[in-house]
Design a protein with these regions (language model features):
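Short, solvent-exposed loop/turn and secondary-structure capping segments
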Residues: 47-48, 76-77, 139-142, 211-213
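Conserved beta-strand elements of the Class I
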Residues: 128-130, 168, 198
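N-terminal secretory targeting modules
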Residues: 1-4, 83-160, 189-193
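A general structural motif
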Residues: 30, 60, 124, 193-195
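Short, compositionally stereotyped local motifs that mark structural "simplifiers"
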Residues: 1-87
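Alpha-helical cap/lid subdomain in secreted, periplasmic
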Residues: 152-166, 175, 181-225
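Residue-level detector of short, conserved catalytic/binding motifs and their immediate flanks
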Residues: 63, 125, 165
Length: 225
């Protein structure tokens, strides 16, 4: 009698820093964990960001996660609640850094993040544009293949406006403030000049879910990075 293989799953644990660590168990090599934090309304986890690093979230935060192969879930959705009493004032989502994958049809968020980190390390830019699709679709590096024609709306004006500067485009389509905060805390500024100028244009994609004050708090957190 042939012994069946163990079913895939996800192990959730806390590291010494109190961050949530998610580990895929018995999973195929191409499987990825997708997750969200404090989702107030049901969202399809297949469009949420990949788990790429331990999750920083306040006590009481709800982290949903599921293992996917492509966009098909291969484990049931699970929820982990961060231990400890929740703060008296709920921490807005704009201050909880997380990944996303809402624009997966035209670009890969995680791959663009890796490319941006590499370019910043190698070129030591002195001008960085941090934003969402309005910035992303302008021009400049990194370039998302194979959709260059869709995502590079005006490379000529980018070249004109950044002439003489080592500029990097840190705009990511459909990013909310908390997604940019995650990116900056995970390497996208590592290697930039100490006196680099950062141009921040964020918040549009938060308007449906956050108050103006919450968006402002998140933008301030981004600027402090």
């Amino acid at each position: 009698m042939t012994e069946s293989s163990p079913s895939p799953g996800i192990r959730a644990s806390l590291n010494e820093a109190g961050e949530l660590v998610l580990t895929a168990m018995n999973a195929p090599p191409e499987a990825v964990i997708r997750m969200d934090v404090n989702a107030d309304s049901p969202r399809m986890l297949c469009t949420q960001g990949r788990y790429l690093a331990p999750v920083q979230a306040p006590p009481g935060a709800r982290i949903r996660f599921r293992l996917f192969r492509g966009k098909r879930g291969i484990t049931p959705p699970e929820t982990f609640i961060m231990p400890g009493p929740p703060p008296a004032r709920a921490v807005p989502s704009t201050l909880i850094p997380c990944t996303q994958d809402r624009d997966f049809m035209i670009y890969d968020w995680a791959s663009r993040h890796e490319a941006a980190c590499r370019i910043v390390r190698e070129t030591h830019p002195n001008l960085l544009f941090i934003g969402d699709s309005i910035t992303h679709f302008w021009g400049g590096a990194p370039v998302d293949e194979p959709h260059r024609d869709i995502l590079q709306k005006s490379p000529e004006t980018w070249n004109l406006c950044t002439a003489g500067m080592r500029a990097v485009n840190l705009g990511f389509g459909y990013d909310r403030v908390e997604n940019a905060l995650w990116r900056l805390r995970h390497g996208e500024l590592d290697g930039a000049k100490d006196n680099a100028v950062c141009v921040v244009l964020l918040g549009t994609n938060n308007l449906a879910e956050n108050t103006d004050g919450e968006i402002l708090e998140g933008i301030r957190a981004v600027c402090r990075e």
